[in-house]
């Protein structure tokens, strides 16, 4: 009888031990199937991360758009005036102004109304598509109507984008009170400091600021 009792106790203990282990396993499985503590904020964290990613993508797109944009926004800081050209049709520059086999490398015809107080004008043609490549740089301009081919070859070189491409060419007519020491920037070369060099026109040769009265702008594309 005692032997049977001992076997019964051992068997009961084994059953209890097995049940305890099973309960522990069930508890572990239930914990694994439930969200961990603090994960209630996970959807919000994902949302914030997605928002941040979206913002980053937007910033990249904005930067790319800014890089592609032919328009230098800082020009808006100045008063403006209208510039017209008979060398521009439907937003496209005529072949004659280009430095290609189908052009004559003649500077575009330009015309504008005189700006009050302006002693002279500076003319710049910029290709923002090619790191602000400067195609035209004339200073001490006193006329307000320039014929096609007015600029010399030392001041003007027409558009010559790579074959199969389209570039934008912007002409700025800057009305100044007085002459500047020099118009900065590489003619027929890249100008990574285009904005800084442009703003330098606001200081005259005597060091006086506020030299830029207004800026006229005309823009068009050319394809090769």
Question: Predicted regions: what is each one?
Answer:
Residues 6, 28-31, 39:
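Intrinsically disordered, low-complexity segments
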Residues 3-5, 20, 36:
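Ala/Thr-enriched low-complexity intrinsically disordered regions
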Residues 10, 32-35:
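Serine/proline-rich low-complexity intrinsically disordered segments, especially terminal tails, linkers
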Residues 19-30:
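Bacterial N-terminal signal peptides
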Residues 35-224:
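N-terminus-centered regions that define maturation/targeting leaders and the start
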Residues 1-14:
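N-terminal secretory signal peptides that target proteins for export/translocation
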């Amino acid at each position: 009888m005692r032997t049977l009792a001992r076997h019964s106790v051992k068997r009961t203990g084994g059953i209890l031990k097995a049940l305890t282990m099973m309960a522990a396993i069930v508890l572990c499985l239930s914990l694994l199937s439930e969200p961990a503590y603090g994960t209630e904020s996970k959807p919000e964290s994902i949302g914030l991360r997605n928002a941040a990613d979206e913002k980053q993508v937007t910033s990249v797109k904005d930067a790319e758009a800014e890089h592609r944009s032919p328009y230098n926004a800082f020009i808006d800081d100045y008063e403006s005036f209208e510039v017209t050209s008979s060398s521009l049709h439907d937003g496209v520059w005529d072949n004659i102004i280009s430095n290609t086999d189908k052009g004559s490398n003649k500077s575009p015809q330009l015309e504008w109304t005189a700006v009050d107080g302006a002693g002279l004008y500076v003319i710049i043609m910029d290709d923002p598509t090619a790191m602000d490549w400067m195609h035209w740089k004339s200073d001490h301009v006193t006329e307000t109507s320039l014929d096609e081919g007015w600029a010399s070859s030392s001041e003007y070189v027409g558009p010559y984008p790579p074959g199969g491409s389209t570039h934008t060419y912007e002409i700025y007519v800057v009305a100044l009170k007085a002459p500047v020491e020099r118009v900065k920037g590489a003619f027929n070369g890249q100008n990574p400091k285009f904005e800084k060099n442009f703003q330098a026109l606001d200081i005259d040769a005597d060091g006086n600021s506020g030299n830029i009265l207004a800026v006229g702008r005309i823009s068009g594309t050319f394809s090769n």
